[in-house]
Amino acid sequence: MQFEMLYSKIHRAKVSDANLNYVGSITIDKTLAQSANLLAGMKVEIVNINNGERFSTYVIYGDKKGEICLNGAAARKVQIGDIIIIIAYATYTHNELEHYKPTIVQVNESNQILSITNEV
């Protein structure tokens, strides 16, 4: 049996930009994305705390420190300054769950890392 579980998340990131004319995705500061084990092209779920929207997109790495930019159609689901949660899931076998440790990255208002933990 396989279980879909939380793989990692960036908690309470602030949207720094929204680019309707870009071809989809969420641009995330590369250092921040990698601290959450998010790979370029990885599917993520976005939860907008301000308006309750939930939607899926994929990660691209950004060069700007603290950058969180929703692109394409996803740009219509956020406003600059909104607080979001970026979530990735993965599929695990029962045996893999013995060593299950999701990565939780907490950030401040500038999207700088406050803490990284492995507890749900």
UniProtKB/Swiss-Prot annotation:
<dbReference type="Pfam" id="PF02261">
    <property type="entry name" value="Asp_decarbox"/>
</dbReference>
<keyword id="KW-0704">Schiff base</keyword>
<comment type="pathway">
    <text>Cofactor biosynthesis; (R)-pantothenate biosynthesis; beta-alanine from L-aspartate: step 1/1.</text>
</comment>
<comment type="similarity">
    <text>Belongs to the PanD family.</text>
</comment>
<feature type="active site" description="Schiff-base intermediate with substrate; via pyruvic acid">
    <location>
        <position position="25"/>
    </location>
</feature>
<comment type="subunit">
    <text>Heterooctamer of four alpha and four beta subunits.</text>
</comment>
<dbReference type="GO" id="GO:0004068">
    <property type="term" value="F:aspartate 1-decarboxylase activity"/>
</dbReference>
<keyword id="KW-0963">Cytoplasm</keyword>
<dbReference type="InterPro" id="IPR009010">
    <property type="entry name" value="Asp_de-COase-like_dom_sf"/>
</dbReference>
<keyword id="KW-0865">Zymogen</keyword>
<keyword id="KW-0456">Lyase</keyword>
<keyword id="KW-0210">Decarboxylase</keyword>
<feature type="binding site">
    <location>
        <begin position="72"/>
        <end position="74"/>
    </location>
    <ligand>
        <name>substrate</name>
    </ligand>
</feature>
<dbReference type="InterPro" id="IPR003190">
    <property type="entry name" value="Asp_decarbox"/>
</dbReference>
<feature type="modified residue" description="Pyruvic acid (Ser)">
    <location>
        <position position="25"/>
    </location>
</feature>
<dbReference type="GO" id="GO:0005829">
    <property type="term" value="C:cytosol"/>
</dbReference>
<keyword id="KW-0068">Autocatalytic cleavage</keyword>
<keyword id="KW-0566">Pantothenate biosynthesis</keyword>
<protein>
    <recommendedName>
        <fullName>Aspartate 1-decarboxylase</fullName>
        <ecNumber>4.1.1.11</ecNumber>
    </recommendedName>
</protein>
<keyword id="KW-0670">Pyruvate</keyword>
<dbReference type="GO" id="GO:0015940">
    <property type="term" value="P:pantothenate biosynthetic process"/>
</dbReference>
<feature type="binding site">
    <location>
        <position position="57"/>
    </location>
    <ligand>
        <name>substrate</name>
    </ligand>
</feature>
<comment type="function">
    <text>Catalyzes the pyruvoyl-dependent decarboxylation of aspartate to produce beta-alanine.</text>
</comment>
<dbReference type="GO" id="GO:0006523">
    <property type="term" value="P:alanine biosynthetic process"/>
</dbReference>
<feature type="active site" description="Proton donor">
    <location>
        <position position="58"/>
    </location>
</feature>
